[in-house]
Design a protein with these regions (language model features):
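N-terminal twin-arginine translocation
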Residues: 21-27, 38-63
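N-terminal secretory signal peptides
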Residues: 1-27, 34-42
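Hydrophobic transmembrane signal anchors and adjacent membrane-proximal interface regions, especially
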Residues: 27-31, 43-47, 242, 248, ...
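Short alpha-helix boundary/capping motifs
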Residues: 28, 56, 196-200
Length: 333
């Protein structure tokens, strides 16, 4: 049994969500898991215009997702680092950035085109031996938990989300990188036939992001495979996405298919598009404005309130040491 010590940034989950609400939600999720496959099958059966191959693919996805849902809820080992309540699931699920499917926020419907299971993941680059595995094979080997994190978008809004998944450090250990690996480069899927945004050839698809190895091994770096106590919805970046809460949200790449360990610093998606506005590091700092707007405050989604933004989004104690000696670099853009 994995015994976890409470870190300085953790609070009991019942301080974030009233205990009876949280326990009722978990009981509901346990009882409703079995219904997912049946409901999905009915939805597929009701689409008379769908081809047989598409029906089979949808049924397979529904079955695999239902099996993944049986693992939920994950043990809740962490909580929000400040007194800020969870963002309502409806709000968080209907206000999303996912440029593969469009540049607007109501992306959930378009993102349903993404088939998130089966899903193959490639581990490559400066590792002892490159390999591929299925998302559920990966999940089966990982220490699973739920963490409640802030998410601060570079657009000056924020939400507070209960991610389910595993520490990125566990994936790094599984990959067995060589000593020559200094960075972890991640890429999302590439399929313009379902992702209309990828037909916009002026963007440098596929979406690419990167971390230093020190950042990837930091205790806060997290791979999310679920949210709100169930598998990730497509708009959140199913079936696996990054969550690095001390950085602006565009660093938390979605729907990852490739992890490459490399000795060369990756050029990220937005860095390639507008390097004067978006950089490799992208750490949150209220005193460093975006070239076109202030980062001093943020709108908390669903509340109508603006609050002061905190250095490293409130996670300074856990991550500031990562950047000692790098003061000459553009750490906050």
């Amino acid at each position: 049994m994995l015994i976890k010590r409470r870190r300085s940034w953790e609070l009991p989950e019942n301080q974030v969500t009233p205990e009876h609400v949280f326990l009722n939600r978990r009981a509901f999720l346990r009882g409703s898991t079995a219904s997912i496959a049946g409901a999905s099958a009915l939805m597929v059966a009701g689409c008379g215009e769908t081809s047989g191959a598409a029906e089979a693919a949808a049924a397979s996805e529904a079955d695999l997702t239902a099996k993944a849902a049986e693992l939920f809820p994950y043990p809740a080992n962490t909580s929000i680092p400040v007194d800020r309540p969870l963002t309502d699931e409806e709000v968080a699920s209907t206000y999303n950035n996912f440029y593969e499917f469009g540049s607007h926020k109501r992306i959930a419907r378009a993102a349903e085109a993404l088939v998130s299971r089966p899903w193959r993941i490639e581990i490559t680059g400066e590792v002892e031996e490159p390999f591929e595995l299925d998302i559920d094979e990966l999940i089966a080997q990982m220490p699973l938990e739920e963490r409640i994190y802030r998410l601060r978008c570079v657009e000056a809004w924020s939400m507070t989300v209960p991610w389910s998944g595993f520490p990125l450090a566990a994936l790094v250990d599984l990959a067995k990188p060589k000593s020559t690996a200094r960075y972890l480069k991640m890429q999302t899927f590439m399929d313009p036939s379902i992702a209309s945004g990828q037909k916009q050839v002026w963007y440098p698809w596929p979406y690419t992001e990167g971390l230093t190895m020190a950042e990837a091994r930091n205790e806060l770096a997290f791979m999310a495979t679920g949210v709100y106590g169930k598998p990730l919805g497509e708009q959140f970046g199913a079936p696996i996405r990054l969550a690095v809460p001390w950085k602006y949200g565009f660093k938390s790449i979605k729907s990852i298919v490739r992890f490459e360990f490399t000795g060369r610093k990756p050029v990220s998606f937005w860095e390639e598009i507008a390097p004067s506005e978006y950089g490799f590091w992208a750490n949150v700092n209220p005193e460093v404005p975006h070239p076109r707007w202030s980062q001093a405050t943020e709108e908390v989604l669903g509340t109508g309130r603006r609050v002061p933004t905190l250095l490293y989004n409130g996670y300074e104690e856990q991550v500031a040491s990562l950047y000692k000696g790098l003061e000459g670099q553009n750490l906050f853009r």
